[in-house]
């Protein structure tokens, strides 16, 4: 093989960014099959599964964006798309917890590397991002999770979207139930307390993102409890 031919072969085989067509197809799926955060898994499976598969194929061979916000957006969209695919692949279970290995055994390829959902979140996204707001952008397929947006993430809109997702979750009965002197929080704040800086960091984070009146009503040392997590599938 000539050097020119070898160079061409390596170029064609090298990972590339997720192409615009695949991203547009994924955006179309979200717009069509997500309403108020709930997913029409049956409709997606029956009508447009090849488009989801096409997007995940593009994710599998993509290179990781170098820019921080773009890489975070890539990981978030990949995670959420994999959840959609995995729910459908397992026959739309009543709960993702009914599927053994849903998070820690089922493997998908992201940017050329085999990974599970747990590994994608805990070994790739979280250590790279060091931003606890990502917990409110990742959608695990359960009612207790943050809701799935009908629009993909991008590097350009990441900051605003993470803030919006965090505030939306904390002002929902699933995320936080605040009153004078006490607050009940999603178990996310218990499971991932370390990402928020421990118990004190959790309260600082919650105060920062709650509406001002609710944050003030908590007082200096509010009683903190945790809401039972609803693992029912987030389907329409």
Q: What is each of the regions a protein language model found here?
A:
Residues 4-12:
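Hydrophobic helical h-region of N-terminal Sec-dependent signal peptides
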Residues 16-236:
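Interaction/scaffold regions that mediate signaling and macromolecular assembly across diverse proteins
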